[in-house]
């Protein structure tokens, strides 16, 4: 399945990383909406209905964990694919979000934009 035109919501408070990810995703033909905090991200997830969400864990207003719990508790957003971007590589942090049904977990210090974009494309192509 083609990924061009698929909608990705990028929720990340680090402006540099947000812009770098956005540019890389747009180069692959994806429609990218961005949010700089968890509250805005949750609002956009509900109104824009993205095909996939890239979600930072530590953000102002609402944490990524709070956003993820709200997404999974809402019938309209329950099934959306979510990839986590986090500074934490602690197993308990990974397990906590994994139990909420994520499609992947990336540690920012090891982040490769190529690898991230490849994973996003893979997940979006897998949609039926």
Where are these regions (language model features)?
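Acidic catalytic/metal-coordinating carboxylates
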Residues: 37-40, 63-69
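Receiver (REC) domain active-site loop signature in two-component systems and cognate sites
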Residues: 59
